[in-house]
């Protein structure tokens, strides 16, 4: 039996069977292969995805330019610039230590240099920095480029919900898809088997030879990292954001030692509310994206068995401390994304007058921010909770 980390020449894509792909390598009308790929972001997950891409571009030279540029936010580590360490030692010692990177992966500290001539842009940065990055890129990339967002989350305000790929698309005028799944970066970097989902509907201006599902499959698929390409960006994006609220509810149950049956109840109810939310605010999203894809139920399961949101809620239940207190103690100044998402979702559904349609989301918010007892969760599962009920915090 072949180890999944060893040679995969027997299963790599046969590029000779693919159409010759022409594309833009400058801002002129000249079209010629292969695709040039740049990764924007070099953190734990960003470096892992860049490693995968560099492995695949090296094996598919007719389809991709072999050199992959990865934008690195320059910082000093152990007396040297991080980009220099990556380029000389082929290891990201700060964010992905111990993992050897392909020598065709090049760290570039200048953002515009990193994306110059690129046809495929991979966004993999903390979403709070997205606007700043987009403002620097605007007007400086090929307008015919395509993009994939590896960011998980939504932009929520009182009026509605925006998908992060749509924000990228609107800012840069380029078509953007999404990649998400049950993908713990360290496990993927160590070449342990996992799956992921790519959401990418073909753009309205698609022509033969453009980036399509085959190209994206070839770019991301590895023997240890299996890829399924679908068209539902909204379903993948909703699942990636809402899972963190559900992980908090499961963490509450774990902290109170209610057992596996109770955790299963939270997962079941959370999955249903996740689907309902997606269908309500993005009617075109597919139920199958939540129930069949790695970006849906698989990522939900992984998030609800560990991670910072689960751990925060577990400690809250065990100690009686507030979310703010626990966050300060265990996250070293960082934020648990589930807290932010829970508040944003509450404000949205309250503004839309549909709190009672999402009792798990609403109750989790009330526990986090208004001192409601965690013990109300079983009552919530009977769908009797609403903000007009008596005060359950005493």
Curated annotation (Swiss-Prot):
Intrachain S-S bonds: none
Binding-site positions, NAD(+): 41-46, 152, 185, 308, 337
Top enzyme class: oxidoreductase
Binding residue positions for substrate: 152, 308-309
Pfam families: NAD_Gly3P_dh_C, NAD_Gly3P_dh_N
Domain of life where this protein originates: Eukaryota
InterPro entries per the UniProt record, alphabetical: 6-PGluconate_DH-like_C_sf (IPR008927), 6PGD_dom2 (IPR013328), G3P_DH_NAD-dep (IPR006168), G3P_DH_NAD-dep_C (IPR006109), G3P_DH_NAD-dep_euk (IPR017751), G3P_DH_NAD-dep_N (IPR011128), NAD(P)-bd_dom_sf (IPR036291)
The protein's name in its UniProt record: Glycerol-3-phosphate dehydrogenase [NAD(+)] 2
Species in which this protein is naturally found: Cyberlindnera jadinii (Torula yeast)
């Amino acid at each position: 039996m072949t180890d999944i980390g060893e040679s995969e020449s027997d299963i790599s894509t046969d590029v000779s069977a693919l159409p010759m792909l022409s594309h833009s390598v400058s801002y002129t009308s000249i079209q010629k292969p292969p695709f040039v790929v740049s990764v924007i972001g070099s953190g734990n997950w960003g470096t892992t995805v860049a490693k995968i891409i560099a492995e695949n571009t090296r094996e598919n030279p007719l389809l991709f330019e072999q050199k992959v540029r990865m934008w690195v936010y320059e910082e000093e580590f152990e007396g040297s610039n991080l980009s220099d360490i990556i380029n000389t030692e082929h290891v990201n010692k700060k964010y992905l230590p111990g993992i050897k990177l392909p020598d065709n992966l090049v760290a570039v500290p200048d953002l515009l240099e990193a994306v110059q001539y690129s046809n495929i842009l991979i966004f993999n940065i903390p979403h709070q920095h997205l606007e700043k990055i987009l403002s620097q890129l605007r007007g400086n990339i090929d307008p015919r480029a395509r993009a994939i967002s590896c960011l998980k989350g939504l932009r929520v305000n009182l009026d509605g919900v925006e998908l992060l790929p749509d924000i990228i698309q609107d800012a840069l005028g380029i078509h953007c898809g999404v990649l998400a799944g049950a993908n713990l970066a360290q496990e993927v970097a160590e070449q342990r088997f996992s799956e992921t989902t790519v959401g990418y509907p073909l753009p309205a201006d698609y022509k033969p030879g453009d980036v399509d599902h085959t190209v994206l499959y070839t770019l991301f698929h590895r023997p240890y990292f299996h890829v399924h390409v679908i068209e539902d960006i909204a379903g993948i994006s909703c699942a990636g954001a809402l899972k963190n609220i559900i992980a908090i509810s499961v963490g509450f149950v774990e902290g109170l030692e209610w057992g596996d049956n109770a955790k299963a109840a939270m997962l079941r109810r959370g999955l249903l509310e996740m689907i309902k939310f997606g269908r309500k605010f993005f009617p075109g999203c597919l139920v199958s994206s939540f129930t069949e894809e790695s970006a849906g139920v698989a990522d939900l399961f992984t998030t609800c068995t560990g991670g910072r949101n689960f751990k925060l809620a577990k400690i809250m239940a065990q100690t009686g401390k507030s979310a703010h207190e626990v966050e300060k103690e265990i996250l070293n100044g960082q934020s648990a994304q589930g807290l932010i998402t829970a508040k944003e979702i509450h404000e949205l559904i309250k503004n839309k007058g549909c709190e009672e349609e999402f009792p798990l989301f609403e109750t989790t918010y009330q526990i986090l921010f208004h001192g409601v007892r965690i013990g109300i969760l079983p009552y919530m599962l009977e769908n009797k909770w609403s903000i007009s009920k008596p005060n359950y915090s005493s």
